[in-house]
């Protein structure tokens, strides 16, 4: 459905000073919430970044058990430990919900590599099963999930 090995990489020096720069610590674990937005002008970042676009699903491959996944609300760039996915005809919030599901988190954790800093490998990510109901059903599922989470808060 998406390729876990493909991301558009850019040098930090090529980014506009007003670009949104997303780092791992900006995403709350297990919630899908953005904690803060930083701009290039506020950082001293010199490392390469992955580009992303509004509507992309941003997935942290580092320490998959932290379950850090958001949907981008504007274009920007992120650490190379975050993968930017364009799910095309799949509802992006449904894709986010699936990537955050216990099923996928367990799958990602079962074959991560690295002891101190485990990561989900591209091959394992590409082989993941992805249940794909019709688009209207994807929207209904997300609406139900959001309704249940509202009741929790």
Residue ranges of predicted features:
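Solvent-exposed alpha-helix faces
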Residues: 60, 143-146
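Non-catalytic DNA-recognition/assembly elements of restriction-modification systems
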Residues: 1-14, 131, 135-143, 150-153
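Short edge beta-strand segments in beta-sheet-rich domains
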Residues: 17-19, 77-80, 115, 123-125
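Short amphipathic beta-strand starts and helix->beta connectors
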Residues: 110-114
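Sequence-specific dsDNA recognition surfaces
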Residues: 2-12, 20-54, 72-74
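Short, glycine-/Ser/Thr-/acidic-enriched flexible segments
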Residues: 27-29, 64-65, 90, 135, ...
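A short beta-sheet element
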Residues: 48-50, 57-104, 109, 120-123
């Amino acid at each position: 459905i998406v390729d876990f090995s493909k991301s558009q990489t850019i040098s930090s020096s090529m980014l506009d000073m007003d670009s949104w720069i997303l780092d791992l610590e900006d995403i709350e674990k297990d919630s899908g919430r953005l904690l803060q937005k930083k701009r290039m002008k506020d950082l001293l970042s010199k490392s390469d970044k992955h580009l992303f676009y509004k509507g992309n699903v941003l997935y942290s491959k580092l320490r998959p058990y932290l379950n850090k996944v958001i949907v981008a609300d504007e274009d920007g760039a992120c650490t190379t430990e975050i993968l930017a996915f364009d799910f095309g005809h799949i509802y992006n919030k449904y894709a986010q919900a699936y990537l955050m599901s216990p099923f996928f988190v367990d799958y990602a954790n079962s074959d991560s590599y690295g002891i101190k800093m485990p990561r989900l490998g591209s091959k394992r990510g590409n082989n993941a099963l992805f249940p794909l109901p019709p688009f209207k059903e994807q929207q209904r599922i997300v609406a139900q999930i959001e309704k249940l989470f509202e009741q929790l808060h």
